[in-house]
Structures are given as C-alpha cells and as structure tokens.
Amino acid sequence: MDNVINDEAIFKYCESNPKDRDCLCIHPEPTIEKIGEDLLLPYYCWYEPCKRKTAKIPTALRDNMKRCNLIDCSVSLGEINLLDGILKVNNDCLSSHAIYAGYSVKPLEQEIHLPIIDPKYLILGLAILALIVLINW
C-alpha cells in the first residue's frame, strides 16, 4: 500500500514539475525515447536521469529497470582529429593503458552509368508502343 501512495506522490509531483531533473526519467524528451527505439533498448536502461540516486521513479518503472541487461560506462573523449581520412582520438583517461586502433577511410571505386534514355521518356515510349500494338491488334 505504501508503494501505491508513494507512486501517486511521485506522479503528482512530476506532473507539476515535468522539467525537474529528478522527474526526467518519467518525462523524457521525445528525442531520448526515439534514441531508445533506434537502439532497441529502453531509455530507462541507459538514460542518466534514471540513474540518479534522487530520481523519482515509480515502482513499476523501477521493476523494469531491474531487468535491464546492460553494463553502463561513461567514455570521455579528449581530442578528436580527422586527418587525411584517418580518425585520431586522443583519450587522456584515468588509466595509463591505451590500445591503438588505426582506422582509414577509402572511397569506393565505382563507375556510374547514366541511363541512355531518361526514365520518364522510357515509360512514355512504352505506353505509346503498347497503344500502337493495341490499335493494330
């Protein structure tokens, strides 16, 4: 019974204060929900306001959050450069261990063949040809 009363208080407070940082887990921005759909991962599993200790989270949402199969980590990138198609990331983190991974971008070598006849004229020509065949038949 306490959970119901507590949940009602949470919803009441967050309806009155939807922009409060502690209520953003209940009222996320549409872009956050869209990112969750694109990731195929509910926003409450990774969205920072849902991880806050002071977040106002109702019982049902808290139960759903327990099912999140996700390891949460924060990555902070320092300097990022793109030079001659090579992405260089300098990450000065707390650890002294770094793994170098070189990436390069190579444009596709492909030939583009333009159609001899514009497709709209091709369709028109086929329609006229079908009409001529129909008349002569």
From Swiss-Prot:
GO BP: fusion of virus membrane with host plasma membrane; symbiont entry into host cell
Keyword Membrane applies: yes
Compartment(s) of residence: Virion membrane
InterPro entries named among the record's database cross-references: Pox_virus_G9/A16
Membrane topology: Single-pass membrane protein
Transmembrane as UniProt keyword: yes
Primary site of residence: virion
TM regions (residue ranges): 115-135
Keywords, alphabetical: Fusion of virus membrane with host cell membrane, Fusion of virus membrane with host membrane, Membrane, Signal-anchor, Transmembrane, Transmembrane helix, Viral envelope protein, Viral penetration into host cytoplasm, Virion, Virus entry into host cell
GO cellular component, one term: membrane
UniProt function note: Envelope protein part of the entry-fusion complex responsible for the virus membrane fusion with host cell membrane during virus entry. Also plays a role in cell-cell fusion (syncytium formation).
Family: Belongs to the poxviridae A16/G9/J5 family.
Protein name: Protein J5 homolog
Species per Swiss-Prot/TrEMBL record: Fowlpox virus (strain NVSL) (FPV)
